[in-house]
Amino acid sequence: MFGFLKQVGDYTRDAVDAARNLAQGFSVTFDHMQRRPVTVQYPYEKLIPSERYRGRIHYEFDKCIACEVCVRVCPINLPVVDWVMNKATKKKELRNYSIDFGVCIFCGNCVEYCPTNCLSMTEEYELAAFDRHSLNYDNVALGRLPTSVTTDPSVVPLRELAYLPAGEMDPHGVASDRPRAGQLPAQVLETLTPPAKPTAKNDGQSSSEAKEGDA
């Protein structure tokens, strides 16, 4: 008899624990259901990188003096500097400069120690390619300035979509009753788009119709 009661008590305790754990899991799920979406719809939306973001390296051929400081400070000796000695001027003459971004760790040492500031970090991070050899950028490819996220016409930044009300930086700290909170990008654009103005053709038609009515 006591064994049966003990089994019933253990079963009841296990059932209560299971219900409590299930309720805790659902509470976390319901809490996230009340929050607005924060997923960036890449590539149509992009986050603006920080000012000190270490992206693809930009290289200025005219400033380089072929000192090879970037090669010495690189942890993996990555930059390849091709130069010849000009016997007339007794100075190095740069022929080619290349960096393989398939191997680069973007530590920024080359940019930090360059004496002529011919190297700089950009905000470009889209370096995916089907062929790893195409990631080996020469001085021509390194000299191209990337298109900024803020000026790319194919990208609408999150700030322009007005996901967050003015003055708000934390997406989870915004009340659900605030204007535009939790709306989709299409809905936000509808609220921001001004109404269409009547064209001159329509105005002419309306004026002619009014004259006919007066006649």
UniProtKB/Swiss-Prot annotation:
Q: Highest taxon of the source?
A: Bacteria
Q: Which UniProt keywords apply?
A: 4Fe-4S, Iron, Iron-sulfur, Membrane, Metal-binding, NAD, NADP, Plastoquinone, Quinone, Repeat, Thylakoid, Translocase
List the signal peptide residues: none
As for subcellular location, the record says: Cellular thylakoid membrane
Its source organism is Synechococcus sp. (strain CC9605)
**Keyword Oxidoreductase (UniProt):** no
- The positions annotated for binding [4Fe-4S] cluster 1 are C64, C67, C70, C114
4Fe-4S ferredoxin-type domain ranges (all copies): 55-84, 95-124
Basic and acidic residues bias spans: 169-180
Subunit notes for this chain? NDH-1 is composed of at least 11 different subunits.
Which ranges does the record mark as transmembrane? none
Query: What is this protein identified as?
Result: NAD(P)H-quinone oxidoreductase subunit I
Q: Where in this protein does the record put region Disordered?
A: 169-215
Gene that encodes it = ndhI
Biological role: NDH-1 shuttles electrons from an unknown electron donor, via FMN and iron-sulfur (Fe-S) centers, to quinones in the respiratory and/or the photosynthetic chain. The immediate electron acceptor for the enzyme in this species is believed to be plastoquinone. Couples the redox reaction to proton translocation, and thus conserves the redox energy in a proton gradient.
| Catalytic reaction annotation | a plastoquinone + NADH + (n+1) H(+)(in) = a plastoquinol + NAD(+) + n H(+)(out); a plastoquinone + NADPH + (n+1) H(+)(in) = a plastoquinol + NADP(+) + n H(+)(out)
HAMAP family associated with the record: NDH1_NuoI (MF_01351)
Q: Which GO terms describe its molecular function?
A: 4 iron, 4 sulfur cluster binding; iron ion binding; NADH dehydrogenase (ubiquinone) activity; quinone binding
How does the UniProt record describe the way this protein sits in the membrane? Peripheral membrane protein
> What is one GO biological process annotated to this record?
photosynthesis, light reaction
NCBIfam families documented for this protein: ndhI (TIGR00403), NuoI (TIGR01971), PRK05888.1-3 (NF004537)
